[in-house]
Amino acid sequence: MPTNLLLALVLAMTITPAYGAALPPCPASPNCVSSQAEDKHRIAPFVVKGDPAQAFSCLHTLLLKRSDTTVVAFDKSMIKVEIRTLLGFVDDGLFLLAPDMAVIHVRSAARLGYWDLGKNRRRTEEIRQQFTQACLSQ
């Protein structure tokens, strides 16, 4: 199999999780939150009301409008973002649509450092509030 084709397959599989796919686990450090974590990293998923695909598309639009956020990958079930902090650090965000559960799973983690002073949790809650106002009140 040609190397380019193999590389394309690997990339497609890593950036396009299936519905209900698992988020990567958080590291032991306190600089990550995940709606699929069972410990101190746990944060609630975004609840979807109405059409899940429409809500997910609305979340995508909301993320595109944020000045600190760059959408690096998007498909019908996954949004992957990079978020630049005021100090220039880059955090990674991942949103996975689980339409059968009427939720969007979320993970946000710092790329560097040990402790983020709760920034990923606060930012995720801020995005949740924006999502609720913009996407669920239609």
Feature-to-residue mapping (PLM):
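Bacterial N-terminal signal peptides
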Residues: 4-16
